From Swiss-Prot:
Compartments it resides in: Cytoplasm
Assembly and interaction partners: Homotetramer.
Xref: CDD domains: FBPase
Superkingdom of the organism of origin: Bacteria
Family annotation (InterPro entries): FBPase_C_dom, FBPase_class-1, FBPase_N, FBPtase
Family of this protein: Belongs to the FBPase class 1 family.
Lineage: Bacteria, Pseudomonadati, Pseudomonadota, Alphaproteobacteria, Rhodospirillales
Primary location: cytoplasm
Pfam family of the protein (one): FBPase_C
Protein known as: Fructose-1,6-bisphosphatase class 1
Gene name tied to this protein: fbp
Binding site for Mg(2+) 1: E92, D113, L115
């Protein structure tokens, strides 16, 4: 019964008491919760509200924006500026930082991908929002990108909202991972997935196989071994998954194990990779590590990568710890022979 479940707000208050906090973190999370509820509503309305299709514009990445990309970005900016907890924000959709006017006392910075996987939205496949929270460094200017360029290990919290058959918000504050499901009847996120842990054993991998011709040898080696199944060196059959929505991929891995790869390849290597360090890789790495998994570029721990720009791209390999470590070892062996 819903009334017997812990609400996300109550959960945050419990965390606040445990840590002896002032309440400012609970307040800023409340803003994110409202933003995710509003985006969920707009995603669910879809074609009924004229929300599908392209917006006729491009984002800073040079990617065509969907109508819901623009709407979700506006919702995140507006809702999270109201509370005054954030000194500044940065979005995957914006070229520069977004200073929050009238938030002189703001102690935190918010980075977000307002609508991950939006290429799927017109065909009704799950999409999501990803967010990362950092502390504003002492004496830093929240209007400068330098304040945001902190490695992933500096994150205070990270999470994502998944807009699928139900809407979920998955969150870590550095004390494990918990999942909350939106009950539309009462308008609240309720704790449904406490202490989420990635299973150690896995028989699934997620990769865009259409890019195989661009892969580096260590990635080819790993995928080839998985494909060989019981007859190969792994001694078991694997299944391949690919949704083209990072939130959906990571959520599946949190629930039943697996590994997600968007590796460096010969086509994207000059850009550093495909996915964005600050908006996608770091928050997901924090969540995955807190759930007992691992996240790497293939050549180092994701959350230790020094950021050089707001829109820096990196290779991403994350999921079940043993699989991620195996892929990292294959990269090390390959590099040692070059």
């Amino acid at each position: 019964m819903p009334y017997k479940r812990i609400t996300l707000t109550h959960f945050l208050l419990q965390e606040q008491r445990r840590l002896g906090g002032s309440g400012s973190f609970t307040a800023l999370m409340t803003d994110i919760i409202f933003a995710c509820k509003m985006i969920s509503h707009e995603v669910n309305r879809g074609a009924l509200a004229g929300n599908l299709g392209v917006a006729g514009s491009e984002n800073v990445q040079g990617e065509e924006q969907k109508k819901l990309d623009v709407l979700a970005n506006d919702i995140f900016l507006h809702m999270n500026a109201l509370g005054g907890s954030y000194a500044g924000m940065a979005s995957e959709e914006l070229e520069d930082v977004h200073a929050v006017h009238g938030a002189a006392d703001g102690k935190y910075l918010l980075l977000f991908d307002p609508l991950d996987g939006s290429s799927n939205i017109d065909v009704n496949i799950s999409v999501g929002s990803i967010f990362s929270i950092l502390k504003l460094p002492e004496g830093a200017n929240a209007g400068s990108k330098d304040a945001f360029l902190q490695p992933g290990v500096k994150q205070v919290a990270a999470g994502y909202a998944l807009y699928g058959s139900s809407t979920m918000l998955v969150l870590t504050t550095g004390n494990g991972v918990n999942g909350f499901t939106l009950d539309n009847n009462v308008g609240m996120f309720l704790l449904t997935h406490p202490n989420m842990t990635i299973p150690a054993d896995t028989k699934e991998f997620a990769i865009n196989a259409s890019r195989e011709r661009f892969w580096e040898p260590p990635v080819k080696r790993y995928i080839d071994e998985c494909r060989q199944g019981k007859e190969g060196p792994r001694g078991k059959d694997f299944n391949m998954r690919w949704v083209a929505s990072m939130v959906a991929e990571v959520h599946r891995i949190l629930c039943r194990g697996g590994v997600f790869l968007y590796p460096a390849d010969t086509e994207n290597m000059k850009k550093g990779g495909k996915l964005r360090l600050m908006y996608e890789a770091n928050p997901m790495a924090f969540i995955v590590e807190q759930a007992g998994g691992a996240a790497t570029t293939g050549r180092g721990r994701m959350m230790e990568v020094p950021p050089t720009g707001l829109h820096q791209r990196v290779p991403v390999i994350l999921g079940s710890k043993e699989e991620v470590e195996r892929i990292g070892a294959y990269h090390a062996e390959y590099d040692a022979k070059k």
